Amino acid sequence: DNLCYRYKKTSPYVLDGVSLELEKGEIGIMLGRNGAGKTTLFNNILGISRPVSGTISYDGIDMTKASRRQRARKIAYVPQNIQFGTLSVYDSIMLGRLSYFGVRAADSDRRVVENIIKEMKLEELAMRSVSELSGGERQKIAIARAMAQQPGLIVFDEPTGNLDPANEELIILEARKLAKQKNISILSSLHDINQALYFGDKFFFLKDGKIKYAGSHNIVTKELIKDIYDVDVKIITVDDRKVVVKNPMMTIIS
């Protein structure tokens, strides 16, 4: 709430009074041009950076004052690129849990990991090295690692950034299904406005370190996109979904 951040005391604010709220199970999408402040906001939420002022609250707990372990019990992170090494799928997911909650796996940890593998239909991959898997499969393992923390909020940094179109849709559907089934909130950055409209429930458009627009699908208009991205588009409806089109093809806005 009212989050402010700058790199030096004499530098301008990169985040200037940013406020946003997500309900449990709600998917929020951060949008804006490069340099708008999306990564900086995520770093503040994850505890990588500390805000100059303002609060980051979850269930009434001020996350700016929480320990690494306390934060990990509430907030998980899925980066755009994650290094798995030669670990098996099972070990990689377990590591995602033990990194925060203990050095040795207890029976309770094993049950958590085994349930995630079953829920995400990863049984056939469990003993394979993650290095052997496709990009879409690796991204699915990254989501499973985050789920192993049993968080209330998962922060995604461009979850489909390195995937082909078929896998992009699969990952978005998987993440959305888990959010709704587990009542987990998601906050994700995306460059593709059409993916965002497909994935999200609520949208936050950053400009010059401020959230200039916030709301549901209804706020997304050609005037908004012109203001944020300086791009002229048309918005049409396909199968009851808004689609942003830049003649003659759909556009990816970044």
Predicted feature descriptions by range:
Residues 108-125, 150:
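Conserved ABC ATPase "signature" region
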Residues 31-33:
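The feature captures the beta-strand-to-loop junction immediately N-terminal to the Walker
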Residues 54-62, 71:
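Conserved ABC transporter NBD signature motif
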Residues 129-133, 137:
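Conserved ABC ATPase signature
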Residues 46:
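Helix-to-loop junction immediately C-terminal to a conserved catalytic motif
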Residues 154-158:
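Catalytic Walker B motif of ABC-type/P-loop ATPase nucleotide-binding domains
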Residues 13-15:
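Conserved structural motif at the start of ABC-family nucleotide-binding domains
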